[in-house]
């Protein structure tokens, strides 16, 4: 549960403009929450300047955060972060939005990639792909669409009419997709790497938007276009 507290302030130093405000985050459960996602829509804050960076503070401790551009207009639409909350508790964090750019890096918690295979068999990284609904580049997309992972598990999303989520299970905590590319070698498997653990076929996999014809699920088709995009692409250091 989010609550924006009163007392917004705007400060300007040199050419940098800042806006600070407090956000109360509460956990009404009888159970603690780890890495609870918090999303703040910037349109509701109305900073009145172009936001290029943000800082979220829990007392004297900074919480890693990211600004997301959801519609591709090169302007952030939301601020997202995760926070640990004990059972039946509240925390108040201070958010500062700034017009200044930042080269700040945070420890990696996730990884995502989308690769297009060229004629020489090399995999070219891309952040967004849009094709007509009549086109099919399923086999030109390495691992058939975007792949993303936490330290615990990885997924891929098929870039075709199935739009199915597939799962890559892990034996050990850590990141593997950049190295294994969703297809671990025998040597990597011997080192304890995980692997694709689900035969998706024509099913919904872990979950997918499907139609229903009264008897069975159906793919959503035809469509005018297909788009897949990595919304937040940040530089991390570990």
Each predicted region: which residue ranges?
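Solvent-exposed N-terminal domain segments of exported/luminal and surface proteins
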Residues: 101-221
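Bacterial Sec-dependent N-terminal signal peptides
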Residues: 1-18
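Short amphipathic beta-strand and strand-loop transition segments with alternating hydrophobic
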Residues: 64-71, 224-233
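Alpha-mannosidase-like glycoside hydrolase catalytic domains involved in N-glycan trimming
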Residues: 15-136, 142-145
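Residue-level recognition of short, structured coil/turn motifs
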Residues: 5, 59-60, 168
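Conserved small/polar residues in nucleotide/adenosyl-binding loops
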Residues: 236-237
